[in-house]
Amino acid sequence: MYFVTVNGKEWITAHDKTLITFLRDELNMTGTKDAAAADWVLIDGVRTSARSVRLSELKNKEILTVEGIPDGEMAAIAAHLAAPAALSGGFFAPGMAITAKEKNHWHEARPASREILDMVSGKKKFADDINVPRQVYVRPIFAKNPGARIIKIDFSRALENVRFGDCIQKADIPGEFDGMVGVGDTVESTNQVAALVVTTYLAEMDALCRLIDLEYDAVTESVPRGTPEMPECATAVYSDDDTLTIYTNGKDPQKIRESCAKALDIPEDWITVVATPVANTKSGRAEVYAALVAWLTQQSAKIKF
């Protein structure tokens, strides 16, 4: 068991994990963002990346997130940060607030607007902050061995786990989408997705992904995928009338709508794309993956990678 003190309250959890995962997925504290420079918290008063520290390292430590900054102090910080107009869409604003809190680089100023205050306090919702009831979670399995051909995608071991939901492959795509590689295809890069693992148990996702076996006709040298500074993410909400609402942080909602409709082979007016504040210019694939899973499973789906 792990005991973690966050914003003056002690929490208990059974499994070791990164602090960012614990805050966002277990405590639903979404003010701290899963991206470099947006993931700052104070640990015993020292600014620390929540993505770089695990719960096992936090015994007897005091953690302060952006949600734990008192309202009066947060209002002053928001006013200070608004002065240089440096907030842009607001995604990195909570990390800036933690930095200001640590260094006391703030002062009483004229009140900030509600929009600015929501940005700085982390209350402004981005695509990765959206959670809906009874949603499933999705994780892509990326191909390896560029230049080799995939000869088998085997998820029989995963079927033995009661928490396994599904494994979506290229052959399952109803329409046209070039964002996946399947059996018989030659891998061009390690950014290509071979399968989408689905489960309702986010805590089991890593274990389930390890049960998916990809076989190739050769082993080649490739550069491993690094951890992105900012993840791609999207949530697709499935409705009983066979319509989808997709939450994106991409810059072009209409293009995303067109891509999703083409992949699902359905009319565009069955899809509504809700643009949360822009946070990732690489967005575009995640929305289609989420839409595919939501459409095929008839459940709302959330993906992040």
Question: What do the PLM-derived regions correspond to, one by one?
Answer:
Residues 1-96:
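Signature of N-terminal electron-transfer/Fe-S-associated modules in redox systems
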Residues 36-39, 137, 183-185, 230-235:
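Short glycine-rich loop/turn motifs
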Residues 44, 51, 66-68, 84, ...:
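Fold-independent oxyanion-binding glycine-rich loops
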Residues 87-222:
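Flexible, low-hydrophobicity surface segments
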Residues 88, 140-168, 195-216, 234-299, ...:
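Alpha-helical support elements that line or immediately flank enzyme active sites
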Residues 176-179, 225-233:
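Extracytoplasmic beta-rich repeat domains
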